[in-house]
Amino acid sequence: MAAAMIWWPRFLLLLCLTCKGSTFYVPGVAPINFHQNDPVEIKAVKLTSSRTQLPYEYYSLPFCQPIKITYKAENLGEVLRGDRIVNTPFQVLMNSEKKCEVLCNQSNKPITLTVEQSRLVAERITEEYYVHLIADNLPVATRLELYSSNRDSDDKKKEKDVQFEHGYRLGFTDVNKIYLHNHLSFILYYHREDMEEDQEHTYRVVRFEVIPQSIRLEDLKTGEKSSCTLPEGANSLPQEIDPTKENQLYFTYSVHWEESDIKWASRWDTYLTMSDVQIHWFSIINSVVVVFFLSGILSMIIIRTLRKDIANYNKEDDIEDTMEESGWKLVHGDVFRPPQYPMILSSLLGSGIQLFCMILIVIFVAMLGMLSPSSRGALMTTACFLFMFMGVFGGFSAGRLYRTLKGHRWKKGAFCTATLYPGVVFGICFVLNCFIWGKHSSGAVPFPTMVALLCMWFGISLPLVYLGYYFGFRKQPYDNPVRTNQIPRQIPEQRWYMNRFVGILMAGILPFGAMFIELFFIFSAIWENQFYYLFGFLFLVFIILVVSCSQISIVMVYFQLCAEDYRWWWRNFLVSGGSAFYVLVYAIFYFVNKLDIVEFIPSLLYFGYTTLMVLSFWLLTGTIGFYAAYMFVRKIYAAVKID
C-alpha cells in the first residue's frame, strides 16, 4: 500500500508533464516552399452554423466560380465531417499585394442575384453561417480584439485580448436588415526560410487571416482588368440583401502579406490555443484532486473492512458468529450463478471492450502528436478503422465470458457481438442521414461511402469478431473460486437505497465529476465548430475515469453482496454506466443554455447523435466497471475458506 501511495504522485506528475505539451503535434504533411510570385491556392471547405448543425458545400450559394470546378479527393473522416474541399477563383501570389480585385467581373458589370438566390443567401445569413477557406492547408481565421480592464493598474487601462474565430461570418443582420460580406481582405503571414547566398529565398505560409467587409455596390469603383477601388474610411454603407427581389453586387477581395517569426512547425498554435487554458488547467487539477481524494477514501474503507471480514471469517472457532454478522459471505454459493440473457450481456461487454481499446489507442496516439490537425479527417478515419480491427479483442473477451456463463451457442453469440451495438449505431445514423439528405446538406454521407462502411463492417469487423470469439470460446473459462449451489438462495427484501435506479444515480456522480469540464470543451468542439487538440488533458481525464468507474463499481457490488443480493451481473453493468445518465442531462442543459437551435431537423440531429454518444459512453463505463467488479468478487471469495 505504501509503495502504491509513492507511485501514484509520480504517475500523475508524468501525466501532467505530458499535458503540458498537449498542443504538440507531428506535422502530417511536408512543408511547401514558395518562391516569389508563386501561386498560393485558396480552397473552400464548407459552410457551417452552430444554429442548424447542417454543413453545406461552398458553391451551394451563388459565389463566384472558377472556369473549372475541381473537388479534392477526400478520406473517410473528411466525408463524415461534411467537408467538400473545392478550388476557388481567388488569385493569390506569394508575397504579392493586391489592393482590390473584382471576382467574376464581366465588362465591369455587377452580379445579379435572382430572387431565389437572394432568399437563400439571406436565409444562410440569418442562420449565422460561417465560410471556411484554406490556404496551403491552413484554415482561415477572423481576428477578434476583445478589451478588458486591467484592475492592477491605477488608471485601469483596457488590455487588448486577441482571439481568433474559425472561418468568417457570411454576413450580419441589423435592425431587421440583412447584409452580406462581399469583400474579403486576406492577410497572409509568411516565414522566410534561411538559404545559401547563391539560392533564391523561399517562403512558407504560417498564418491565414481574413477581414470580411460589406461594401455597397454604389461605393465600389471598378477599373480595367478587374481592378477596383475601395471607399475611404467610414464613408461606405454595407451591401444589403433584400430576399424579396433581385440584388446587384460585386464580390471583391484584397491580399496583404506580412513577414512572421512563426516557424512552419508552429503555425497551428494559433488555432489550437483558442480556449482559456488557465481555466482548463484549474478545472482539470481540481477534478483530479477531488476524484482521487474521494476514491482514496472509498478504497481505504473497502480494503480495511474487507481485511477485517476475511480475517474473522477464516477463524475456525468464530465461523457461526461471522456468518451472522456479514452478508457477503452468505451468498458464496450463488454469487457466480449465471445471469439471465448471458449472450446479450457478453455481447454488450465485447462491444465495450472494442470501444475501450479504440478510444485508448486514439487518445494516446493523438496525445503523442501523431494525428496532426493538418491531416484533415485523420482522427475520425483512424477511429473508424481501429474500431473495426479491435473486433478481434471484443470477440475474444465476449466469447470467453459467454463460456464462463455456461453458454453453448457460440456462433449465435459471435453474430450478436458483431451486430448488436454496430447495428444500433448504423440504424440511427441511417435515419438521421435521410433527414440530412432531405436538406441537401454536405453532411449527408454519400451512398458509395455508406456502401464502403457496410463493406468494412461485414468484411473486416464481423470476421475479426468471429475469429476472436472462436478462440475466446475455446479458451479455458474464468476460474471461479467457489462452487455454485444447485438451489438458488432466497434474496431478502432490499432497502430503498439498493434500488437499481438509485444505484445508477449514486454511482454516476463521481465519474461524471471527473470529466464534466472536459465534456464542455468536447461539446464546444463538436457543436460549435471549434478545434479540440488538448489530448494530453483528455488522456489524463480518461485515466481518472477508468479509476473512478472501477472503484465506484467495486463499492456498489460490495454493498449489494452485503445486502445478500447475488444478482450483480446485469445490475453492476447498468450501475457502472450511471455516469452516462448525467452526460444525457448535461447534453440537454447544453442544448437549452448554450445552443440557439429552434428548428426540428437540427434538434433531431443533436439528440440523435447525443443518443449515440450516451449509449457508447454507457457501454464504455459499464464495461470498465463490470470487469473491475468481476475481478474484485473473484478476489474476495478466493481469500476466504469455504468448506
Swiss-Prot record:
It comes from the Eukaryota. The keyword Chloroplast does not apply. Residues 24-282, 369-377, 439-450, 524-536, 593-599 are extracellular. Residues 304-347, 399-417, 472-502, 558-571, 621-643 are cytoplasmic. It is found in: Membrane; Golgi apparatus; Early endosome. InterPro entries: EMP70. GO terms for biological process: cell adhesion; phagocytosis; positive regulation of protein exit from endoplasmic reticulum; positive regulation of protein localization to cell surface; regulation of intracellular pH; response to hypoxia; vacuolar proton-transporting V-type ATPase complex assembly. Associates with proteins harboring glycine-rich transmembrane domains and ensures their efficient localization to the cell surface. This is Transmembrane 9 superfamily member 4. It comes from Mus musculus. The gene is Tm9sf4.
